[in-house]
């Protein structure tokens, strides 16, 4: 299967999860996108879904994909997992610091007992990935940046028109999402979500 412009990887996940447990064949999936941050996000999500136990991976992936903040413990585990998993490519880049940014660098990861992910990205993508993992932005800083977009007074009409089009019962939760960016049920405890998302 080839999935170009793979901005949304849900179809890929549904296809792979839909394979029968008795499937013994080989399944090659090629995904790409021209947007660097989409590629990085998809790589991190595929890593999470492959490395962590299914229930934990589902929650981690959901918040990594959609929430503006993460619980401190989750953020720590993700950073450690990504750093360990991508150590080989990081060491390779450190040995050749003058390599041009458009040079393709590849690495492979084992995904459980049967799977393998082969990742080929320009050096610039890897550099950005590592800088994102090293970024230490405060929760307040992240909220301020997010509010400049989601709560911007110039966008008020857009927000209010959107709220008018959704059922009244959904408006308070949508407004809450505009404000805090957490994909949680309305009224759920948000106190653990203290770290800016990667």
Per-segment meaning from a language model:
Residues 20-198:
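Class I S-adenosyl-L-methionine-dependent methyltransferase module
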Residues 1-16, 26-32:
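Conserved class I S-adenosyl-L-methionine
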């Amino acid at each position: 299967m080839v999935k170009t412009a793979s901005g949304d990887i849900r179809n890929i996940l549904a296809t792979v999860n839909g394979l029968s447990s008795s499937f013994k064949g080989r399944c090659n999936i090629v995904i790409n996108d021209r947007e660097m941050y989409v590629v990085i996000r998809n790589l991190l999500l595929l890593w999470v879904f492959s490395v962590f136990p299914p229930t934990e991976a589902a929650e981690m992936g959901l918040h990594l994909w959609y929430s503006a903040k993460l619980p401190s413990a989750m953020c720590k585990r993700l950073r450690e997992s990504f750093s360990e998993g991508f150590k080989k490519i990081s060491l390779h880049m450190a040995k050749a610091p003058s390599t041009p940014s458009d040079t393709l660098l590849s690495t492979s990861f084992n995904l459980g007992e049967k799977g393998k992910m082969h990742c080929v990205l320009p050096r610039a993508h890897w550099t950005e990935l590592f800088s994102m993992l090293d970024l230490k932005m405060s929760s307040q800083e992240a909220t301020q940046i997010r509010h400049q977009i989601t709560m911007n007074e110039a966008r008020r009409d857009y927000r209010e028109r959107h709220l008018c089009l959704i059922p009244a019962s959904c408006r308070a939760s949508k407004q809450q999402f505009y404000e805090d960016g957490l994909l949680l049920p309305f009224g759920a405890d948000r106190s653990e979500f203290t770290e800016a998302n990667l």
